[in-house]
Amino acid sequence: MVMTDPIADFLTRVRNANTVYHDKVEAPASNVKKAIAEILKQEGYIKDYESVEDGKQGIIRLYLKYGANKQRVITGLKRISKPGLRVYAKKDQIPRVLGGLGIAIVSTSKGIMTDKQARQSGLGGEVICYVW
């Protein structure tokens, strides 16, 4: 079966694993997914991630993070720009997620970055997803 939106599949795997309190989640690797995982790690939403070579595409493995009493660190993940409806934002129209409590992951001409980094760099781009 051909996957039409690999990023949405990746986010859904993370969301589902987070819902049932799994310690780790695996997905087929790509450079975009690695960049998203790096942002999630920098922002403190996951413990760590690693890329595992399997002779084909490779696998990206994320180690999920939970607070005291199994409180989820990631409370929500939402795909914004989809293959059927791309969503772009100019540098002065980059959205704030929950008034700054969450992050928007934006694909810019300088790479994939958070909404805050894009605002500081004065760059717009495709809004990939929201994380809160």
From Swiss-Prot:
Keywords: Ribonucleoprotein, Ribosomal protein, RNA-binding, rRNA-binding. The keyword RNA-binding applies. The keyword RNA-binding applies. One of its GO terms (molecular function) is rRNA binding. Gene3D superfamilies: 3.30.1370.30, 3.30.1490.10. InterPro entries: Ribosomal_uS8 (IPR000630), Ribosomal_uS8_CS (IPR047863), Ribosomal_uS8_sf (IPR035987). One of the primary rRNA binding proteins, it binds directly to 16S rRNA central domain where it helps coordinate assembly of the platform of the 30S subunit. Belongs to the universal ribosomal protein uS8 family. HAMAP family: Ribosomal_uS8_B. This is Small ribosomal subunit protein uS8. The lineage of its organism: Bacteria, Bacillati, Bacillota, Clostridia, Eubacteriales. The gene is rpsH.
